Amino acid sequence: MNSYNKQIGNIGEAVAENYLIQNGYIILDRNFSCRVGEIDIIGKDGDIISFLEVKSRYGNLYGSPGESVNFAKQYKIYKTAQLYILKKKLNRFYFRFDVIEIIFNNYNDDYSIRLIKDAFQL
């Protein structure tokens, strides 16, 4: 990943985290990684543990950001989530996989954000 894309990703994750907090989430972890993969944000939404993939981009020219969360990426998130659940002893909770799409406007600091709850299941 080039540094420009990484910068957009970091800004997107910060925007997503603020959005989640404003909407009542408790942030449990950020950028949890293991040998299998990485999860951008792990939050608690009521009594549900939410594993969130944040996808950010400028404009919508190449489709919605969430479209890039293909089956291979979903599987890595799922396997990483399993390890997180075991490590943190969270097996008593329900959990789901969400995607947050952030599209930045090319002309100013404005952006649109969309939270897709239960974006995928495995």
From Swiss-Prot:
HAMAP family: UPF0102. This is UPF0102 protein CTC_01256. One of its GO terms (molecular function) is nucleic acid binding. Pfam families: UPF0102. InterPro entries: Restrct_endonuc-II-like, tRNA_endonuc-like_dom_sf, UPF0102_YraN-like. Belongs to the UPF0102 family. CDD domains: PoNe_Nuclease (cd20736). Gene3D superfamilies: 3.40.1350.10. It comes from Clostridium tetani (strain Massachusetts / E88). Disulfide bonds: none annotated.
